[in-house]
Amino acid sequence: VNTMRQQGNIWGSYAKDRDGWLTDEIREYIKDKSEYAYFPGCTASFVEQDVAQSTALILKEAGVEYSYIGKDEQCCGIPMLVSGRWEVFDETAAKNIESMKKLSANTIITTCPACWLVWEIYYRHWAEERGIDYPFHAKHYADVLAELIEEGKFKLTGDIGRKVTYHDPCHMGRAGVRYEGPRTLIEAIPGSNFREMRFNKQEAHCCGAVLTLVADPDVAEIIGAKRIQEAIDTGADTLITACPCCRVQLKRSRDLQGLPIEIRDLSTLVAESLGYNIPESNAVIDEKWGVFEQMIRLMTPWGMADLMADMIPELINAMPDMYRSMMNMVIKAPDVFKEPMISMMTNVMPSLFPKLMPDIMPKV
């Protein structure tokens, strides 16, 4: 919550670095005001910058002019919404809507399906409930490009020489009922050799990202591995998705399980077909998610227990003399006496420790 309020994202990154994904070519193309505005979202801005860059360059190649909020962009707020911190979501919605109005845009193009869902549905409801003017509609980049392809205004020519299958993100599919845009875009890529998984569209299995991954990484690994195996069963060599968070989860599950398939975001394959050679963000994904996962595991009861176990010598040394002597006596006592002594302390420590911790922790 503090990171959201202070830095506008949940990845622990600095707000000043939000536009760090911009290349000179993209920066020069961005308009001050435009009918379209690009909203990369947190994961594409801070973690999967190859996705943000690919999307921005694809839109440029398709002739779509767009503006961009830049450093003032905030997280869409959906993590706060689903975790019940509605007051933080309120603050975020107000900031983003105000910033977007300054760009004079009426169509917001997103990289992330969750951001699309928020801009198209949740922000609209939020604004209507408060009597605030809301002149926006949102589209995922895949839908924008699919429309241009169907109108004959955008064509891909570079053969990528792959066998691909597609994972439907839950926010885009089940929640948003957006299935055809990504498929139109995939099939327009020469050499994509697209094949569907057995469970697709409204029947597509979740990859295990978002709430599952945050709540229980071990369960998420199993869910992700099952989804990846479905992709492998199609004979595909590349599993693509149109959601940065799905990519993080699928890549993590693949790496942990050692499964033989490449994980890519759709935007990066389109950019590849257009001749762009954009460096992949896999190392950053590993680094950022590694820190995130350590914090998730630390906040579990067993994680805190392991941490406290490692810190016991330092905690004891930082205690007032009386308690330090008592704890050392317990530690040095023969086993036959140790268990009864610990049992006696069990009723005392839950009330005693909160009083001791403010003095102990600064010393530790």
Functional labels for PLM-detected ranges:
Residues 39-45, 71-84, 109-121, 167-176, ...:
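Local cysteine-cluster metal-coordination motifs and their immediate loop/turn environment
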Residues 59, 186-187, 254:
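Hydrophobic alpha-helical packing residues
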Residues 87-94, 154-168, 213-223, 280-301:
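A polyampholytic, Gly/Pro-enriched intrinsically disordered region
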Residues 130-158, 199-202, 255-293:
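Short, flexible loop segments at boundaries between secondary-structure elements
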Residues 218-237:
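A short, acidic, amphipathic alpha-helical segment used as a generic capping/interface helix at domain edges
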